[in-house]
Swiss-Prot record:
The gene is engB. PANTHER family: ENGB-TYPE G DOMAIN-CONTAINING PROTEIN (PTHR11649:SF13), MSS1/TRME-RELATED GTP-BINDING PROTEIN (PTHR11649). This is Probable GTP-binding protein EngB. Pfam families: MMR_HSR1. One of its GO terms (biological process) is division septum assembly. Coiled coil: none annotated. It comes from Flavobacterium psychrophilum (strain ATCC 49511 / DSM 21280 / CIP 103535 / JIP02/86). Its cofactor is Mg(2+).
Amino acid sequence: MKINTAEFIISNSIVSLCPQEHLPEYAFIGRSNVGKSSLINMLTNHKSLAKTSGRPGKTQLINHFKINNNWFLVDLPGYGYAKVSKKTKEVFQQFITDYFEKREQLVCAFVLIDIRHEAQKIDLEFITYLGEIELPFCIVFTKADKISKGKVAQHVAAYRTALLKNNWEEMPHHFVTSATEHTGKESLLSYIDEVNQDIFKQNGF
């Protein structure tokens, strides 16, 4: 799939105020500084569609971007950010869970994980949460250019082992990406396109 247009539509923290159009939505979420904004900019061929920042927790709202006029890319706040107040964190967590549990247009969540690190408890807990609410999701490993291919394979295998220990029957669908080298761009966009085509056929688009 080629992305021809990417347009910012709205930022908000209330699910009922999200766009009313019945277009498929793909949510991107991960721990702070996982490289989410860089990945989104790489996928959409924009240098600053999503704002990049070295400060954790910079994204603090639900951000909708309309792609090719027929689907939405949704940029969500990171989880596990340390430099916001406890009350603020609770509010973020509430509207994130509201979005995941109430948003009918959401068809898939992409959970971003920094491939450089070992399996993190907070990532495993979030993946378990998505499984519990039966929301389709994929894992997107980021920053693959920062370590060797051998290390990448080792860390993916470690996540597989950790998930199997947490009662997953198999490793969820996953992608290995690098925003710097555009690694994984085509496979991720192809996946979104395949899901979109199925949805469009079902709805007679």
